[in-house]
């Protein structure tokens, strides 16, 4: 048996409060350790501000910021998969490479979605 004991799980609002701080720690870790996360967040903030200026109504604004949030979420998942794979060992393994590559591909698809939505929207504004 190890010296480390898992504390009993909190319930109710205390659990939600603890979860909020775990999430804050995760965001802080991603911001400090992952340059790709910082780049995605800065681009997302820029696009959210731009969408607030360009969108004609709430629905249009929501559709413009959707790919921004999606890419931030996918980058968090991508980074967590990379951290978990790196934690399991330092040796190269083909399955570890596949896991990292698939997580990266998910982010690529999110960024393509972002580009398609914004590209189509800005093109329509330009051609008006």
UniProtKB/Swiss-Prot annotation:
<keyword id="KW-0997">Cell inner membrane</keyword>
<feature type="active site" description="Proton acceptor">
    <location>
        <position position="75"/>
    </location>
</feature>
<keyword id="KW-0812">Transmembrane</keyword>
<keyword id="KW-0460">Magnesium</keyword>
<keyword id="KW-0067">ATP-binding</keyword>
<keyword id="KW-1133">Transmembrane helix</keyword>
<dbReference type="GO" id="GO:0005524">
    <property type="term" value="F:ATP binding"/>
</dbReference>
<feature type="binding site">
    <location>
        <position position="34"/>
    </location>
    <ligand>
        <name>a divalent metal cation</name>
    </ligand>
</feature>
<feature type="transmembrane region" description="Helical">
    <location>
        <begin position="58"/>
        <end position="78"/>
    </location>
</feature>
<comment type="similarity">
    <text>Belongs to the bacterial diacylglycerol kinase family.</text>
</comment>
<keyword id="KW-0418">Kinase</keyword>
<feature type="binding site">
    <location>
        <position position="82"/>
    </location>
    <ligand>
        <name>a divalent metal cation</name>
    </ligand>
</feature>
<keyword id="KW-0443">Lipid metabolism</keyword>
<dbReference type="GO" id="GO:0005886">
    <property type="term" value="C:plasma membrane"/>
</dbReference>
<feature type="transmembrane region" description="Helical">
    <location>
        <begin position="107"/>
        <end position="127"/>
    </location>
</feature>
<protein>
    <recommendedName>
        <fullName>Diacylglycerol kinase</fullName>
        <ecNumber>2.7.1.107</ecNumber>
    </recommendedName>
</protein>
<dbReference type="InterPro" id="IPR036945">
    <property type="entry name" value="DAGK_sf"/>
</dbReference>
<feature type="transmembrane region" description="Helical">
    <location>
        <begin position="35"/>
        <end position="55"/>
    </location>
</feature>
<keyword id="KW-0594">Phospholipid biosynthesis</keyword>
<keyword id="KW-0472">Membrane</keyword>
<dbReference type="GO" id="GO:0046872">
    <property type="term" value="F:metal ion binding"/>
</dbReference>
<keyword id="KW-0479">Metal-binding</keyword>
<dbReference type="InterPro" id="IPR033718">
    <property type="entry name" value="DAGK_prok"/>
</dbReference>
<keyword id="KW-0547">Nucleotide-binding</keyword>
<keyword id="KW-0444">Lipid biosynthesis</keyword>
<dbReference type="GO" id="GO:0004143">
    <property type="term" value="F:ATP-dependent diacylglycerol kinase activity"/>
</dbReference>
<comment type="function">
    <text>Catalyzes the ATP-dependent phosphorylation of sn-l,2-diacylglycerol (DAG) to phosphatidic acid. Involved in the recycling of diacylglycerol produced as a by-product during membrane-derived oligosaccharide (MDO) biosynthesis.</text>
</comment>
<dbReference type="GO" id="GO:0001727">
    <property type="term" value="F:lipid kinase activity"/>
</dbReference>
<dbReference type="Pfam" id="PF01219">
    <property type="entry name" value="DAGK_prokar"/>
</dbReference>
<keyword id="KW-1208">Phospholipid metabolism</keyword>
<keyword id="KW-0808">Transferase</keyword>
<keyword id="KW-1003">Cell membrane</keyword>
<dbReference type="InterPro" id="IPR000829">
    <property type="entry name" value="DAGK"/>
</dbReference>
<dbReference type="GO" id="GO:0006654">
    <property type="term" value="P:phosphatidic acid biosynthetic process"/>
</dbReference>
């Amino acid at each position: 048996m190890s010296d480390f004991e898992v504390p009993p799980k909190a319930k109710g609002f205390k659990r939600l409060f603890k979860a909020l701080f775990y999430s804050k720690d995760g965001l802080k870790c991603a911001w400090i350790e992952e340059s790709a996360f910082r780049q995605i967040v800065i681009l997302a903030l820029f696009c959210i501000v731009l969408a607030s200026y360009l969108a004609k109504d709430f629905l249009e604004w929501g559709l413009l910021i959707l790919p921004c949030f999606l890419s931030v979420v996918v980058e968090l998942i991508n980074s967590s998969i990379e951290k978990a794979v790196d934690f399991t060992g330092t040796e190269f393994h083909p399955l570890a490479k596949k896991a990292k590559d698939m997580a990266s591909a998910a982010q690529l698809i999110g960024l393509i979605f972002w580009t398609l939505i914004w590209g189509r929207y800005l093109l329509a504004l330009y051609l008006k």
